Amino acid sequence: MSAAPDFSKRYRVDNGRKFRLKDFDPRDSSGLKSKKHAEKELPRGIERLSELQDKLYAQDRWAILLIFQAMDAAGKDGAIKHVMSGVNPQGCQVYSFKQPSPEELNHDFLWRTSKCVPEHGRIGIFNRSYYEEVLVVRVHKELLERERTPPSLVTKNIWNERFADINAYEHYLFRNGVVIRKFFLNLSKEEQKKRFLSRLEEPAKNWKFSASDVAERERWHEYMVAYEEMIQRTATPHAPWYVVPADKKWYTRLMVADAIISALEDLNLHYPAVSAAKRKELKAARVALEHEGHH
């Protein structure tokens, strides 16, 4: 993206030890004042993303897993929709993880997402993910009971254990050719209120609103503490977090696109080389096609 080469780097966290959420401003747009500028840049970014995805698919070696986590109304759906709009649907899969089903609750906490990890050559997108297990389940500890974990295993160390499990799992995926990029869309409490009110005022947005949204808002501080520790404990060089400002949707989308492009460019993707035997075969096929009907 010409005006923003690796612009998203300032929001990248690949070592969480010193991470503090208060150091990241949800309103930031790093000097980009105009939505117009972003609207010109985003299509260029999407075009570049589409070229890279085509090579990823053809090369069939790496997979990309993009994970989106955020508070309600932060713009996860919109970011996914706008940024991935130019990507070939054959090479991209989106999974939204809602409340777990009884079947999912009867399995280990990574089971439902493991089935959806993208195969080589594909981009997989998780709209929410296994990170819910250290977010909503941590804020609402009664949810642990529904997970049917033996009580003797639910100790005060459970969150540390889950962070360790997630880190080991992401390391395992990386060693198997899955490149992970994780996005926390960092929305301010004031902006969430505005977006909730607009959902209530606009009939076309009413369906997005749920009474539980307001109840969850009352636990905002608890969620911020959970998000901060999640990033501190699971940001690694092979699976970094991007703490993307989310108060300006146009800026969020630009930064998400930039981070995905930079992850793909790091892979030095190219179309598979054609062997001499294959070239010979192609030449013969061309000759046959050109001589069709000349008998």
Report the location of each language-model feature.
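Flexible, compositionally biased loop and terminal segments
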Residues: 1-295
